[in-house]
Amino acid sequence: MAPLALVGVALLLGAPHCLGEATPTPSLPPPPANDSDASPGGCQGSYRCQPGVLLPVWEPDDPSLGDKAARAVVYFVAMVYMFLGLSIIADRFMASIEVITSKEKEITITKANGETSVGTVRIWNETVSNLTLMALGSSAPEILLSVIEVCGHNFQAGELGPGTIVGSAAFNMFVVIAVCVYVIPAGESRKIKHLRVFFVTASWSIFAYVWLYLILAVFSPGVVQVWEALLTLVFFPVCVVFAWMADKRLLFYKYVYKRYRTDPRSGIIIGAEGDPPKSIELDGTFVGTEVPGELGALGTGPAEARELDASRREVIQILKDLKQKHPDKDLEQLVGIAKYYALLHQQKSRAFYRIQATRLMTGAGNVLRRHAADAARRPGANDGAPDDEDDGASRIFFEPSLYHCLENCGSVLLSVACQGGEGNSTFYVDYRTEDGSAKAGSDYEYSEGTLVFKPGETQKELRIGIIDDDIFEEDEHFFVRLLNLRVGDAQGMFEPDGGGRPKGRLVAPLLATVTILDDDHAGIFSFQDRLLHVSECMGTVDVRVVRSSGARGTVRLPYRTVDGTARGGGVHYEDACGELEFGDDETMKTLQVKIVDDEEYEKKDNFFIELGQPQWLKRGISALLLNQGDGDRKLTAEEEEAQRIAEMGKPVLGENCRLEVIIEESYDFKNTVDKLIKKTNLALVIGTHSWREQFLEAVTVSAGDEEEDEDGSREERLPSCFDYVMHFLTVFWKVLFACLPPTEYCHGWACFGVCILVIGLLTALIGDLASHFGCTVGLKDSVNAVVFVALGTSIPDTFASKVAALQDQCADASIGNVTGSNAVNVFLGLGVAWSVAAVYWAVQGRPFEVRTGTLAFSVTLFTVFAFVGIAVLLYRRRPHIGGELGGPRGPKLATTALFLGLWFLYILFASLEAYCHIRGF
């Protein structure tokens, strides 16, 4: 209502002129006949409307007072409705920009041990995207309005486009910042994190309006020359380059190589400054690159290198906190909560906050809650996937495929299984033995034959004879193979081969291995391997100790753990010390060690398990021979030979008597962290993948729940009356814009291009409606632009900044982009429009004339007030306030009142100058 009140004041001030009771100031030149406003340089508004770019004049052009009031209401309502449509199409436009700027490329990452892996690097620099596509997305209506106004009115300068740019800049600088300062909860504050970038963009914002004043009032008053217009346009890329240099610290430091850091907002690797290397090292160093002495001595990299795992640590901490908060939930449930938590707390782009604010206003619901609900309803990628092996055929195989037996056992029994299928066929499968180190005839009996599985039978056994001898020898093995499967009917009659689906097939394991253990030795004791990799989440690891080359007698085997880089005593694992007792003919024992789960993303610590000398407890004749004799009697030759043979049979340690255990990170936990990081890419949240999804969103009403709970466990709230009203007011626009290409198509560029065209069309309509509304009520275009049009184009940005101020931990997303957008509006909005017009009139041999009075005054007024506002923001960074936003109640209210007062004064002075109550330039 404040803008309406100010306009009312302005109308009262200019009322005598509008009613024809006064004449223009004699000292001012007469207005040109072709201007839509009868007197752009004069003092009165005009009731005579001119045709717009798209809308014709509403005939008759001299209506009665009642018709004027009705027309004004129609124009105003239509303009508000167009602003709603503009907000919704800007929502789609910003979503496409988020998808474009989130594009990534792959790089090769080389670990310190030489291993390589593939990582992702964001192509767009965050600062560059904020000043280019993001600024274009939030300021597209103002920029296109200026361009369309000039091009649609025979390349003549108007007041609506430039006035909207300056008025929007004032609204953003004063009202948006005032709202952001006020909404921060008591006792909290927000600071700008990237202060260097803010300084650069703020300086360019001030310079942009100083440059406008120089063009309009100093260099060539009343005329915009070609070089001035083109230089204004060139300042845009120069501003972007300076901001990029500030972000990379190239203005202060020199870098000779490129580093990468992990962006805490999206969890992906972002390239830093310098020349790109072919590959990078995960420890912060690079292939073919020397590390500076100080960094190499400390063993740490610079700040960017130390931030490499920042986002992963955040996700890991989230999971740990959620485990403590919800001890009764399993990992899958915790992951679902963590996904929402990570989305809620990560830093977000301005595009996201703009989209979130628009959808909350139009009854489309909370973006994050909708994404979390869709993810919960969406089945897993593997759910319901058909089993390739479940094709209706019976599967025949050995179960198990490994067998051990002593050479004195006589025979070994092997099992063959038949699983699956319909169970109404007879299967014939052949088997035969094959030599390994054991030979048929000397170590085992050669065997071959046929197994018959009748309908309903699921298991068959076959027996192989083992040959015993009295010769001490190493363990030996042989094989048994399944082959030549035939299928019969239920009565056992063979069926002819058909071209249909097979009823049975042989599957792995088709080969069984039988190991024959020598029974003439107490055994050789060792671990199965020298190295064992375990995950820290295992809890307890089972380590097998095998007894080979014999299993005679009872043997006690001591063992103990020894620290390596991993520490016992409950730090990384629990110490283990004890004895394993192998009974007669027992060939395997298991010892257990408890592993401590630290929930680390990357881990590689080791410890050792050592076996002690085996002790022979219950012995046979060999033990008696070993103990035979005393120190006084010399053994006979026969006794010495017997003792030598017995010595060969005593238990000993094998080659693998020391096992290295390497504790690694949990792969499930690591994959969970990676999935959480991947899922929090905001392009996946706000983008669309199909027209079906877009139309479903368009016709669905959702609750506009702006406040977020920590874990998303709150029950979903029903839409309010306001949500339903806003949905039905905007459902036409939602369904219409659902016809646009989804943001996923062509990496967002298809939606981007179509949105530009639609925004241009709506902007042209808004410009015509605003001009016709102004001429209907006698309101000058310059006042109409700084109040109604600027307000309509800036309302979504206000809500977006409010949401960003509340949810972000810093002030960059809420106010840090305001200054950048203001500079971009001038350099692009006026630079493009004036460059086209100046070149056009230069070709015609005539100058491009711009009426300087109102615009130059507004620019000067805004520049002075902007200096005051930026100075206040910088002062608020002092410790007793804490930051640009929020702070103690007194300074917060004072800052809010000051910024709102500056905006009211700007509107008031601009209106007074437009109606000649105060003199401008």
From Swiss-Prot:
<feature type="topological domain" description="Cytoplasmic">
    <location>
        <begin position="844"/>
        <end position="854"/>
    </location>
</feature>
<keyword id="KW-0915">Sodium</keyword>
<feature type="binding site">
    <location>
        <position position="600"/>
    </location>
    <ligand>
        <name>Ca(2+) 5</name>
    </ligand>
</feature>
<feature type="binding site">
    <location>
        <position position="520"/>
    </location>
    <ligand>
        <name>Ca(2+) 3</name>
    </ligand>
</feature>
<feature type="transmembrane region" description="Helical">
    <location>
        <begin position="721"/>
        <end position="740"/>
    </location>
</feature>
<feature type="transmembrane region" description="Helical">
    <location>
        <begin position="197"/>
        <end position="219"/>
    </location>
</feature>
<feature type="topological domain" description="Extracellular">
    <location>
        <begin position="741"/>
        <end position="747"/>
    </location>
</feature>
<dbReference type="GO" id="GO:0048172">
    <property type="term" value="P:regulation of short-term neuronal synaptic plasticity"/>
</dbReference>
<dbReference type="GO" id="GO:0006814">
    <property type="term" value="P:sodium ion transport"/>
</dbReference>
<dbReference type="InterPro" id="IPR038081">
    <property type="entry name" value="CalX-like_sf"/>
</dbReference>
<keyword id="KW-0597">Phosphoprotein</keyword>
<feature type="binding site">
    <location>
        <position position="518"/>
    </location>
    <ligand>
        <name>Ca(2+) 3</name>
    </ligand>
</feature>
<feature type="binding site">
    <location>
        <position position="469"/>
    </location>
    <ligand>
        <name>Ca(2+) 3</name>
    </ligand>
</feature>
<dbReference type="GO" id="GO:0005874">
    <property type="term" value="C:microtubule"/>
</dbReference>
<dbReference type="GO" id="GO:0050890">
    <property type="term" value="P:cognition"/>
</dbReference>
<dbReference type="InterPro" id="IPR004836">
    <property type="entry name" value="Na_Ca_Ex"/>
</dbReference>
<dbReference type="GO" id="GO:0010468">
    <property type="term" value="P:regulation of gene expression"/>
</dbReference>
<dbReference type="Pfam" id="PF03160">
    <property type="entry name" value="Calx-beta"/>
</dbReference>
<feature type="binding site">
    <location>
        <position position="471"/>
    </location>
    <ligand>
        <name>Ca(2+) 3</name>
    </ligand>
</feature>
<feature type="transmembrane region" description="Helical">
    <location>
        <begin position="223"/>
        <end position="246"/>
    </location>
</feature>
<feature type="binding site">
    <location>
        <position position="520"/>
    </location>
    <ligand>
        <name>Ca(2+) 2</name>
    </ligand>
</feature>
<feature type="binding site">
    <location>
        <position position="407"/>
    </location>
    <ligand>
        <name>Ca(2+) 3</name>
    </ligand>
</feature>
<dbReference type="InterPro" id="IPR044880">
    <property type="entry name" value="NCX_ion-bd_dom_sf"/>
</dbReference>
<keyword id="KW-0966">Cell projection</keyword>
<keyword id="KW-0109">Calcium transport</keyword>
<feature type="signal peptide">
    <location>
        <begin position="1"/>
        <end position="20"/>
    </location>
</feature>
<dbReference type="GO" id="GO:0051480">
    <property type="term" value="P:regulation of cytosolic calcium ion concentration"/>
</dbReference>
<keyword id="KW-0677">Repeat</keyword>
<feature type="topological domain" description="Extracellular">
    <location>
        <begin position="21"/>
        <end position="68"/>
    </location>
</feature>
<dbReference type="GO" id="GO:0007611">
    <property type="term" value="P:learning or memory"/>
</dbReference>
<feature type="binding site">
    <location>
        <position position="519"/>
    </location>
    <ligand>
        <name>Ca(2+) 2</name>
    </ligand>
</feature>
<feature type="region of interest" description="Disordered">
    <location>
        <begin position="372"/>
        <end position="391"/>
    </location>
</feature>
<feature type="binding site">
    <location>
        <position position="598"/>
    </location>
    <ligand>
        <name>Ca(2+) 5</name>
    </ligand>
</feature>
<keyword id="KW-0739">Sodium transport</keyword>
<keyword id="KW-0770">Synapse</keyword>
<feature type="topological domain" description="Extracellular">
    <location>
        <begin position="153"/>
        <end position="164"/>
    </location>
</feature>
<dbReference type="GO" id="GO:0098703">
    <property type="term" value="P:calcium ion import across plasma membrane"/>
</dbReference>
<dbReference type="GO" id="GO:0045202">
    <property type="term" value="C:synapse"/>
</dbReference>
<dbReference type="GO" id="GO:0050808">
    <property type="term" value="P:synapse organization"/>
</dbReference>
<feature type="transmembrane region" description="Helical">
    <location>
        <begin position="823"/>
        <end position="843"/>
    </location>
</feature>
<feature type="transmembrane region" description="Helical">
    <location>
        <begin position="69"/>
        <end position="90"/>
    </location>
</feature>
<keyword id="KW-0112">Calmodulin-binding</keyword>
